[in-house]
Structure formats: C-alpha cells, structure tokens
Amino acid sequence: MNMKGKALLAGCIALSLSNMAFAKDIKVAVVGAMSGPVAQYGDQEFTGAEQAIADINAKGGVKGDKLVMVKYDDACDPKQAVAVANKVVNDGIKYVIGHLCSSSTQPASDIYEDEGILMITPAATAPELTARGYNLVLRTTGLDSDQGPTAAKYIVEKVKPKRIAIVHDKQQYGEGLARSVQDNLKKANADVVFFDGITAGEKDFSTLVARLKKENIDFVYYGGYHPEMGQILRQARAAGLKTQFMGPEGVANVSLSNIAGESAEGLLVTKPKNYDQVPANKPIVDAIKAKKQDPSGAFVWTTYAALQSLQAGLNQSDDPAEIAKYLKANSVETVMGPLSWDAKGDLKGFEFGVFDWHANGTATDAK
C-alpha cells in the first residue's frame, strides 16, 4: 500500500474511532408490572419494548447512539409507582415508557412533570391523566371516554339485552370505564338494572352470581382486569347462568382463559386492533416468536409504537420538552400506523374494536 493509501486508511480508522468515542447510550426507563396480579400486562410491555429497542438499534439507533432499556417494576400499585418514579429521577433518566395502570400512572406522572421527564404511556386510559395541563405526558393508546362509547354502541345495536348489570373493581381504570359505559347506555335508554363494585383480589363471587340470577340479568359489563373476570365467568357458568359478559382490554389476556377455561368462550372485549395480524408487522411477529414470546398482546404493539415515537422525537432533540412539542405537532409512522397527538398528549382518531374472546386465549372480530 502506498503512502497515500495508508494515510486514507488511517484517516478512516481515526474517524471511526472518533464516532465510537462520541457515541453514547440513551437510557430509557420502561416501567410496568413485573409482579402482582396483572404482571402479564407488564410482560406484554417489556416484550414490545425489548423488540422495539433491538430493531431501532439495529438500524443505527438515534444518530448512532444506542437506546438502553432500564426496567422498573411498579406492580400497578400507586405507592410503588411513586417510589419507582423517584428512583427514575435519582437515576438521571429523562425518558419513560410507562406506566401501565391508570391508578399508578397518574401519581407517577406528577413527579415526572415536576422533574422535566417525558412520559409516554402505552396503556393508561384514564382521561384524567391528560386533563391536568401537563406538557410531558403522552400516550399511545385510547381513552376510557373512547372505549366506553364503543362498548355501549355494540351492546345497544348488536346484543340488545333486556336487563344489564355493570360491575367494576373500584379502581381508577375499571370504575372509570364502567361509568363511561353506564353513561352511554343511559343516553341510549338501555335498562341498567344495577351498577356495583367488587373488591380487586377477591376470589369468591357467589354473592354477585346469586344477584345476577335473582335480577334476571342477561348482560354484564365488567370494568377491571382478568383475574376477577376469569373467576366471575367460571363461577357464573358453574351456577348455570347463560348471561353474556363483556370487558375491556384489561381482561383480554391469555391468563383469563387459564382461569376461566371453557367459560371464557364468547366473552366480548373491547381493545386495540390485532396489530400482530397486520402484514407489515410480520417480521416483528416472527422475531418475537423466535424468542418464545407472545406477540399477540395489545400492549406489545402500543409499547413498540411508544418507542418509535420517542425515537422520532430524539432525532429532533434530546430535551424532553422539545420532544413533547415535536410529537404534538407532527405525525409519526409506527407499527400501529401513523400516530398524531393533540395538545393534551392524547392520540387523534384512536379507535377501539370489539372482539369475541375464545377459550384458547385468542380474539377474533366480533360480528
């Protein structure tokens, strides 16, 4: 090699080493339930985050910088969520994907907003979350105020029950959804016989089942999560009830079928569309399956989209406030399709679908 070639090679090596020296890791806090009764939804979130970060980094990351996931467990518990949020602050992380449950997301968001940390939640649906004038809170899912009307419309137009009961778990997510469904059913002059709450964590629902039978209830909407829904379904069917049940995406988990068995067949659920069935997402589905993980969960995809949204913002600025401004003013291409946000941080035009849940843990479009 002549001197000119050696000089050129040396220059290329120096440039490469220089780029490596300046490349840095961008830490992203991914917060969800790794323990507790709804840890299955945390599994979905972390599956989506892990795959999104791997795919983003494989394509060069953010201007050569790699995203690094730092996992935190809030167990969907408000007090633990606050402790986690404070740890995120102390760890010096500026970007959060999470939390999952509305009841834990809201108190954590207070801390993030005060500390200038961007939070994109892939699952919290409570309208109150983005109704407080915060600048750094966004989401990649819809609202209870979207999901409730979708459920009520289907109940009134398709199911047409005569006597309806609405039951919830007394938590922000479940009760908020239940009230949204109730309000919309009343607008349609549907007969809501009773609206009542159970306690999350209960396993004996014989009193509720007896009341459903006594009141001749032919349709139940349940606002809450899968552990209680699974028990209610199993016990209702064991008592001979033919009542139709419906719930939100919080019950749409394969663990529901593990609890309820064949009693889960025919449950109606509202949830985001089946993004794992979108042809363009097949390479991601295959990559997740290759790791023996499940790509079907709704929060796999809303989390993946949250990371894509964060990446789009980071390509413009590393300032959380500037990222939030950018996302609210632009559209981002994601696995969910193009996403855009309003001034509050809510998605524009997000739609929930209605699905038939099956005993094998899958969901198909409801007729």
UniProtKB/Swiss-Prot annotation:
InterPro entries reported in the protein's UniProt record: Leu-bd, Leu_Ile_Val-bd, Peripla_BP_I
Secretion signal, residue range per the UniProt entry: 1-23
Localisation per UniProt entry: Periplasm
Cellular component GO terms, alphabetical: periplasmic space
Disulphide connectivity of cysteines: C76-C101
Main location: periplasm
Pfam family, one: Peripla_BP_6
Annotated keywords: Amino-acid transport, Disulfide bond, Periplasm, Signal, Transport
A GO BP annotation: amino acid transport
NCBIfam families to which the protein is assigned, alphabetical: PRK15404.1
Function: This protein is a component of the leucine, isoleucine, valine, (threonine) transport system, which is one of the two periplasmic binding protein-dependent transport systems of the high-affinity transport of the branched-chain amino acids.
Family: Belongs to the leucine-binding protein family.
Name under which the protein is recorded: Leu/Ile/Val-binding protein
